[in-house]
């Protein structure tokens, strides 16, 4: 169910180079540079719609907002977006991200394989959510 706190919330950011960890485990992400003064939802993993600049098409996505506790808990919070079933070079482009529903809170996994397995579950759960919403 779309949280009343997320209705109408969206934010924009420029895709910047990350460390490539998501891509190396099969889940490429667009790392967004966000104005720190923007209002963002709480940390966690969200089903989201992402729109690429100069496009009106909303793409199903999964967004991680916050730290990367499994990779390196000392890294600053970040916004990363995985476009579901899309492989697009987004570096330097601006994206608009619209959170739809929170899937889960941040979790520190024992290893990268556990993280990758959970991301697959997140994607599957997001796809179930998108079936209930119009873009």
What residue ranges belong to the model's regions?
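Phosphate/ribose-recognition catalytic cores of enzymes acting on nucleotide-derived substrates
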Residues: 4-135
């Amino acid at each position: 169910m779309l949280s009343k706190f997320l209705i109408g919330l969206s934010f924009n950011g420029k895709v910047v180079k990350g460390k490539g960890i998501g891509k190396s485990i099969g889940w490429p992400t667009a790392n967004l540079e966000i104005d720190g003064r923007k209002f963002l939802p709480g940390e966690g993993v969200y089903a989201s719609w992402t729109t690429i600049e100069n496009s009106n098409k909303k793409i199903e996505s999964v967004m991680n907002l916050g730290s990367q506790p499994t990779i390196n808990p000392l890294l600053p919070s970040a916004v990363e977006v995985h476009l579901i079933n899309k492989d697009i070079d987004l570096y330097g482009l601006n994206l608009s991200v619209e959170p739809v529903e929170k899937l889960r809170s941040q979790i520190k996994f024992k290893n990268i394989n556990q993280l990758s397995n959970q991301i697959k579950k997140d994607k599957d759960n997001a796809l179930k959510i998108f079936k209930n919403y119009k873009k």
